[in-house]
Amino acid sequence: MSITNTIIINMRRKFKNADEAYNYFLDKIITDGKDFGNTRALFNVGFTLENPLENYIFNKERNWKPDYAEAEWQWYLSGDPNIKKLGQLYGKIPPIWERMADSKGNVMSNYGWQMYRNNQLDYVIAKLRNEKDTRHAAISIYDCKEHKHYRKDTPCTYAIQFTIVDNRLNMAVLMRSNDLWYGFCNDQYCFSMIQKLVADELNMKVGEYYHYAHNLHLYNDKI
């Protein structure tokens, strides 16, 4: 199957929840992915999660840990980029974050730190509250002016955008790169919690979650 055909198929997919999406793309990457560095990847993938708050991954082989995902979400919510905060919340610091941290223990790709930068979250909530049909309710995560800070890790996400449709809050997440095994499982949990946070502030229901990744992949050791 060509990359073009893969794009067309994936852009039309709707899933009830994150677990259904995970299992589908786990098989899809293995069968139709392209070898790309030390991964197998699908390109320009987009899909919809109809029930974003059904955000648990039940795949037994993956052995996803909801307590860790919640700790990571609380870390982001704190706005503190230092891995010591995650250690306090989870009881230990996962080695991957130690590798990504700078000499002071900060991870500048931390979504919470980026989300609160320039009061972006408050701006989004105020914009949606005052103008329901706005197209400006977006949070920028990736910032080219911060390239010098991305020495050990670069944000996988470009931006998060919110739109009110039929009095429900929809959310779109745009990613440059998304590792299905680790990244998607924990990221979708945190993003769905951001969606819920904003919806609660606006006193409305959560709508759909649109997930777009330029490169959705599995590392070779997970294939």
Feature locations, PLM:
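Terminal, non-catalytic protein-protein interaction segments that mediate quaternary/complex assembly
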Residues: 2-223
